[in-house]
Regions:
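C-terminal segment of classical bacterial N-terminal signal peptides
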Residues: 14-22
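Exposed, interaction-prone regions of secreted/extracellular proteins
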Residues: 25-246
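Hydrophobic helical h-region of N-terminal Sec-dependent signal peptides
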Residues: 8-14
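Bacterial N-terminal signal peptides that target proteins for export
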Residues: 1-8
């Protein structure tokens, strides 16, 4: 599955004062694209996934050195996505070039190929080692202003968005849980190091009845960069990190 990524809509950031990153992973940013490290649900698995949640440990990330634009970004996130990758909702943290606040919360959703993604970045500077619950959940209630059902993105218990569409009947099924670190350039570091990994703990899947269960085994691996790695301590507990800095 081609999983699209959350740097596509950054216009709201253009008013920020650009500052150089404190350090750079590699001096040459190399290839631009969708580079992931982590796990995602195999579409062949026959259980229903209506939402995704995990407690994620924030880790800093060094950005590559020769692309001074806000398209130079490193992230870690949870996601619920359509099986064709055209629609998704996600929440996590991000560090992008030029952000004076460093690593911040972010959320994004996209209805599908019809529409642009809607992105929100926080202003709170996040410290390495802090933990937050990032979740996307399907709901049917008054929070859905434009449809019967919608997806809601949360950081801990704070609602960051309720989608303006109902993915039920629109998104290709089965929907997929994803837990990933990501960069837009192969020269950047995915968040986390071997001594301080980005941990995804208490990973959960939202079932058809709206209740939650621990993430099941049988996830597919993403491993786009030989400098990065990921591991697990159980089906519902995973880590990602940059294993080689050069």
């Amino acid at each position: 599955m081609k999983r699209l990524s959350p740097w596509l809509v950054l216009a709201l950031l253009m008013s920020c004062m650009f500052v150089s990153p404190a350090s750079a992973a590699l001096p040459n940013c190399a290839y631009f694209g969708n580079w992931h490290e982590g796990v995602w649900k195999d579409p062949k698995l026959n259980y229903v996934s209506n939402g995704t949640s995990a407690i994620v440990t924030v880790r800093s990330s060094a950005l590559c050195g020769n692309q001074n634009s806000n398209n130079n970004i490193a992230l870690a996130w949870t996601m619920i996505a359509s099986t064709d990758g055209r629609g998704w909702a996600q929440a996590g943290f991000a560090n992008y070039w030029g952000n004076p606040n460093g690593t911040v919360h972010f959320t994004q959703y996209k209805q599908g190929s019809c529409c642009s993604a809607v992105t929100y970045f926080g202003s709170q500077h996040l410290l390495s080692g802090q933990k937050y619950q990032y979740s996307e959940r399907y709901i049917v209630n008054s929070y859905c202003l434009h449809s019967i059902g919608c997806l809601q993105g949360r950081v801990d218990n704070i609602i960051w968005f309720s989608t303006d569409f109902d993915p039920a009947g629109r998104w290709a099924t089965p929907w997929l849980n994803e837990y990933e670190g990501e960069t837009t350039y192969t020269g950047s570091d995915v968040p986390g190091l071997a001594t301080s990994k980005t941990a995804f703990q208490s990973m959960q899947n939202q079932k058809a009845d709206g209740t939650w269960e621990p993430q099941r085994c049988g996830m597919n691996d993403s491993h786009a960069n030989p400098r990065w790695d990921h591991g697990l301590t159980g089906c519902d507990s995973r880590q990602v990190w940059t294993a080689r800095l050069s």
